[in-house]
Amino acid sequence: MLENEYQLEYFKENGFIRKICKKCGSAFWTLDPNREICGDAPCEPYQFIGNPIFTKHSLTEMREAYLSFFERHGHTRINRYPVAARWRDDIYLTIASIADFQPFVTSGVCPPPANPLTISQPCIRLNDLDNVGRSGRHFTCFEMMAHHAFNTDEKPIYWKDRCLELCSGFIESLGGNVFDLTYKENPWFGGGNAGPSVEVLMGGLEVATLVFMNLSRKNSGKPPVSIDGKDYYEMPLRIVDTGYGLERFTWASCGTPTAYDAVFPEMIPRILTAAGMEDRLENPEVERILGLNAKFAGLMDIRGEKIRDLRQQVADATNISVAKLEEIIVPMETVYALCDHTRCLAYMLGDLIVPSNVREGYLARLVLRRSIRMMQDLNMDDDLGDLVVSQMKTIGLANFEQDEDIVRHIINREVEKYDTTIERGTRTVQRVGQTYVKKNEPVPLAELITLYDSHGIPVDLMGKILKDTGAEFEIPDDFDSQIADMHSENETEKPVSPLAKYAERIAKIPETRKSFYERPADMEFDATVLDIFDNYVVLDATLFYPEGGGQPSDTGMLVTKSTMVRVDEVVKWENVILHKVRENTLKRGDRVKGVLDEDRRWALMRHHSATHMVLRAAKEVLGPHVHQAGSQLSTDVARLDIRHYTHITPEELKQMETIANRLVMENLPTMVKIENRVKAEQKFGFALYQGGVPPGKDIRVVQMGAEVQACAGTHCQSTGEIGPIKILKLEHIQDGVERIEFAAGFAALDAMQHIQSLLNTSADTLSVQTENLPGSVDRFFTEWKDQRKEIEKLRAKIAELELSRIEGINIGGVEVVIKQIDVSRKELVTVAGKIAERGGVTVLITTADGLGVVASSGTGKIHAGKLVGEVCAELGGKGGGKENLAQGAGADPSAVGKALLKAESFIRAEFNS
């Protein structure tokens, strides 16, 4: 497949020979005429452990060596992107360096930030989560060093030959011997693209991959190339997409037993000391075992049953039992995994991800809770927040937007939540286990996933609890990896627009001029009707804003000399705006005057602008991690959903309202610019994308003070035009998301006047001044509570009197009381309970606080739940409960007599059965 793509001048000119691996059958290129295997796992074991193949470099030194090398060879160094992929709407985390430039640069919509460029991009992949720590080489968080070139026919940069030349040159710059290097052919495809690629192998380790992306599933009209049974076509853009593993290069330069030893030279001793495992430090026997484990792991896929095979191979090679081996190696694997996870959390939280139960927050919580569990397994005397902050400091605090104290606070909150989750979730797991024991069925995997997803129970603890219940179950070794995979991509399907059926027709209509951007304060305009179909009118230009991004559309009128039609809704399809009218009496070519509903436009514009101000205030009060999770506007009120790790306090809400209004009073100008997407991202960062990711090469950037967003809505021309902002309500709508409801302008004035009216009415009712309301309400409430206690005491005495006066009937040798007693349900329960305690049966009905029924039974012959159900059915209601006590309610008070008779007949029938 693509064999001709590898017949390169670089290989020929430098003496490389194409060979076929005698073990796996793959084609590879080498300078060694005697080499017979490709150099990849599992064909060749690691050769560099204890025998480094590069000059020794720390992680920081290796990164700088790489970036400097490519800078010297004509590449522009660019800063890393965040690990939260907020410029993407399909993935949550940055999984590769090329992801930084997808989809807009790779599709040719936007130019790259530099060409060619070099970057060292932190990436997070959780698909091998369960292998981290075990294999010696897997990480959740790793840095992909890369050099990229974006080639077009008009502007070629470099292609395969130069890329290979640079790769060999970099390896030589590290002291590597190119004679030991192999380039293995391995065509790449994924995400609708494909191309030839080579794996770069040294010492049995894949250190880099060089992909030459030049094919796409999109038909370009050129002859197709078949890959994996699918047709691909030449792309106009040819992309050099490389990935060099920073951690792997560092490992190969140090020759340590595992990659973790090379990457975490400071964190490993700290964790070992905190876990009381200092004896593992610089222990030759432990190092020998770990090195063998890494070598054997490099030759196999260690998921599932393979982990047991790996244990046996290492045990055989070291002449110790598997049990003894696991005593040595399992705690070390946990230490390694904790080192990795804390670095992963440093990037996640440092790059402003907030743990939650959705999106990237879910993945952060998954890693965080695994870390908590690992610390518990190691009996560590250390703080998770301190470990993560220590990793941030090693990386460099300047690399992160989040403050270290907030990171600690977030982690402390998550640890508290975890403890509560375990306590509550344990009972749930026990119930599930008992249910499947009764069914005599194993607990299915789907149920186990639900227990984790909905209740947050770690898989190992889940297994222990289920085992104690006697339930049968099977938890896959890669359970956490499967969970992560389920949540790694945004698979939400966009709803089909009702306009889709008009797509062909709309495609023939010229783009609508968006006059609402040019003249946002104007309320009238002239335009020409371009098309009319169903109840839609298309104009050549419009001031009517179409619905989008949480902002409802404008409404108003379209007027001609002879007719007038009402515009109820405005929508957009690509670049054409459609006005939905009630009665379509217009025709093509008509000149119309558009007249907006002015009060509505101003209310929506004020609320949209106020949303920016409230968001800015939230960031100033709560921290830079605050990110918009959604918004919705109306003329009366607006709401803003934000991501935050804890509940917002009343004091914080007050500060936010003050800051938002201060920004209004500063009368800051609204600056709107159409900017190149890449330049805007470089200038303002990815906080631009608060309301989603707009398409296109250029984006509309709205700046109001320090708040800058890519935003398509209508805005006031200065913050002063917003008017007062009043926060009305705060809701905790889901874990990690707070909803702020507020009003602006005249809507805020109406809200404040309404609140004042309520205060005045309340003050009049209590005959006090408004400023004395809090004290008066407190006094009245205290008196009310005292009186209620007295009433409860009196009711209890009444219930005792009723109990002493009640005479029952004898049915089957049991005292049976069937009566209407008009006391509260609470007293009914007390009376019924006491009769049941002495072995009796009761049915008591009250109309004191609604039509209520209480039944009790002190004998096994009568089930109170069934009894109350029969009685309530007679009353037109429902009821149920336990065997000894049950309650219900009715709807028909006139049926009380019949219900009491029904109770007696049911009890007699039960005794006679």
Curated annotation (Swiss-Prot):
Methyltransferase in keyword set: no
Enzyme class: ligase
GO CC annotation: cytoplasm
Domain of life (superkingdom): Archaea
A Gene Ontology biological process term: alanyl-tRNA aminoacylation
Cofactor: record remark: Binds 1 zinc ion per subunit.
Assigned EC number: 6.1.1.7
GO MF term (any one): alanine-tRNA ligase activity
Record's keyword terms, sorted: Aminoacyl-tRNA synthetase, ATP-binding, Cytoplasm, Ligase, Metal-binding, Nucleotide-binding, Protein biosynthesis, RNA-binding, tRNA-binding, Zinc
Database matches in PROSITE patterns: AA_TRNA_LIGASE_II_ALA (PS50860)
Pfam families: DHHA1 (PF02272), tRNA-synt_2c (PF01411), tRNA_SAD (PF07973)
Subcellular location: Cytoplasm
Binding annotation for Zn(2+): H608, H612, C711, H715
Residue pairs linked by disulfide bridges in the UniProt entry: none
Co-factor requirement: Zn(2+)
NCBIfam families given in the database record: A-tRNA_syn_arch (TIGR03683), alaS (TIGR00344)
Task of the protein: Catalyzes the attachment of alanine to tRNA(Ala) in a two-step reaction: alanine is first activated by ATP to form Ala-AMP and then transferred to the acceptor end of tRNA(Ala). Also edits incorrectly charged Ser-tRNA(Ala) and Gly-tRNA(Ala) via its editing domain.
Comment on protein domains: Consists of three domains; the N-terminal catalytic domain, the editing domain and the C-terminal C-Ala domain. The editing domain removes incorrectly charged amino acids, while the C-Ala domain, along with tRNA(Ala), serves as a bridge to cooperatively bring together the editing and aminoacylation centers thus stimulating deacylation of misacylated tRNAs.
Official protein name in the record: Alanine--tRNA ligase
Species in which this protein is naturally found: Methanocorpusculum labreanum (strain ATCC 43576 / DSM 4855 / Z)
Gene that this polypeptide is encoded by: alaS
